[in-house]
UniProtKB/Swiss-Prot annotation:
One of its GO terms (cellular component) is SCF ubiquitin ligase complex. This is F-box protein YDR306C. Autoubiquitinated by the E3 ubiquitin ligase complex in conjunction with the E2 enzyme CDC34. Residues 80-90 have a biased composition (Low complexity). The lineage of its organism: Eukaryota, Fungi, Dikarya, Ascomycota, Saccharomycotina. The F-box domain contains an unusual insert of 18 residues (131-148). Substrate recognition component of a SCF (SKP1-CUL1-F-box protein) E3 ubiquitin-protein ligase complex which mediates the ubiquitination and subsequent proteasomal degradation of target proteins. Probably recognizes and binds to phosphorylated target proteins. Residues 112-173 form the F-box domain. Disulfide bonds: none annotated. Coiled coil: none annotated. Interacts with SKP1. Component of the probable SCF(YDR306C) complex containing CDC53, SKP1, RBX1 and YDR306C. One of its GO terms (molecular function) is protein-macromolecule adaptor activity. Residues 1-14 have a biased composition (Basic residues). Pathway: Protein modification; protein ubiquitination.
Amino acid sequence: MANKSRPKKIKAPYRKYVAGEGFSSTRNDNKAKEFTITIPEDAELIETPQGSYYYDETNDTIVKLTRLSNEKKDKKGRKQSPSSSSTSSSKGEKNGKVIESEEARMHSVSVKMVLPWEIQHRIIHYLDIPEKEEKLNKTANGKKTTTGINMNYLLVCRNWYAMCLPKLYYAPALTSKNFNGFVDTIIINKKKNLGHYVFELNLSTILQSGRNSFVSKLLRRCCSNLTKFIAPQTSFGYAPLISLKSCHDLKFLDLGLVSETVKLKELFSAIKNFTKLTHLSFPRSSIDCQGFQDIQWPQNLRYLKLSGGITNEFVIDTKWPTTITTLEFSYCPQITELSIYSLLSQIGDNLKHLFFHYPMPSLAENSLDHVFTYCANLISLQLMVDYCSKWCFSEFMLSKLVEYDRPLKTLYLECSGSLGLASKIHPDDLTIAILESRLPCLKNICVSPKLGWNMKSDEVADLVVSLEDQDGSLYLNY
């Protein structure tokens, strides 16, 4: 038996919120209802993307209109319904414009021109950071820490947020302060999968803030599109090397800051399938060369920086890839003159850029004098005056090429500043080489101030004149 004392259920009318209109009832709205609202003739109609408004002077209020006529234009360019022409003939002139049905309003919205999202996305892609923001986002070292996009763009709407998100995470500017937040965003939030937006991951500024597990998880989350990775000074052990295997699109790998011991065999086991890898930098502190006979070099390697504890046996017995065009030596305490020339005898003719950095304690004061003999196609060369002498630019070491002119364009002369180095290379040594056409393509000479040259002397003036004859210049490199 039913409980008659129970109150009857009453269903509340369902209302939905429509952008630009507010709440509208949808129950029993099977047909669009037509209704008219009269506007005084002297009222000024204001049209916005959210709707139309006019000011009611009698009630001192602003009235919102959402259903404007869409078929005829009035005197001010607004449209008026022909269906109400009979009534508007008597009332239109008197009471003003007539507001039409829901269908007319929807038609008016559909015919409005809207900028496609694809074009907006392309515009956002080319937008630059304002100069004021770039200046504010510079650190004490002068490096930019900007994210590459104005953060206010993400607050415009949901579509703009989705379009700006890839640019925001493309190359995140990480520091010790925001690193933990970045790790939480990439690792913990798996639903958004923000890792596939990261293309460049620079952890060189992270000092004592990460752990091996953090770096390993970051590499796994960002492996799909990661093309550039700079390892941190610490927290790069065995686990990150294992995770590095999944970054198949990697093009730039810099391990120069790693202070932990890296086994050469494990490193090449991780990168052997990197067909797109072009830049590789060895760890600067220590590296274990055991098992180097079985290593397999990336097939498209262009740039190689040797540093750390590489041995003479490794340099002499390794079959170096002929694709290398840029080679750097940086703090190799065990490398001798014999090892360097053994390497240059294999790939010296293919090298376009060759750089030597201080210190190289196993080299003598004239160990680099024969560089031009092994590398005839260099475009840029950096020499440490500590390990070369004036005979490096003599006619015996630097002779003319028979088939073509020597293509060297830029020469860097660096110096550690030790005593007795100011007299090793004199400006006249370079002047004579230029005047004898042994360096016909030389355009730039960058000299370290530690070399001790007097820039106001006649010898330096002669060198400048000889360079100007070749449209070149002399620079003091601080």
